[in-house]
Amino acid sequence: MTQYYYLVASLPLLLFGDPPPFGSRAWLDACREQVAESDHALLARISFAALTPRPGDHELWRAYASWETALRDELAVQRAQKLGLGPDPFLREAPFYVGLAAVAKEALNAGTPKAVEMALDRRRWSRLEELETGTQFGLGRLIAYRLKLLLLERNYRFRPEAGIGAFTEEYARVMENAAAWTRAAAPPSAME
């Protein structure tokens, strides 16, 4: 099993709730020179959007993807129950994990949609910490780091100041366009 002592030792500590120290794309680019090609291909393939580990993929990725799928299934069951729907069309095959129903229920009762997402991401983070125990300097540690970095990037997009800044820029652009359209539509005599 390949060990990545220098790379793992050089990675900044990731803490839940902190901004990401760099983007996951930049991190993958930096890893390209230091990890085996097959390991880099796996790291690049890992995402929350596609929980599709392949046979032969690292055990940590397979274990996490399995747990995440079970969590999503439990969320689908509880949301469907609230809406009076059957959950079957939303479920994917996943093993049973003790306590996952309580995790989903607690998160769904967190309040606002942002609070729900933060509660779920905090639990995802905890699961990754459980799985990475004992991985030391191997690929498992890099997989957990990749997933944590993706979580930090996702949470960073929820920042109110980023939303306010984007809104302010878009509003200014709309107002500029409206003023230009008003001037363009005004009859020539109104401009004199």
Residue ranges and their predicted role:
Residues M1-E192:
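Extended alpha-helical surfaces
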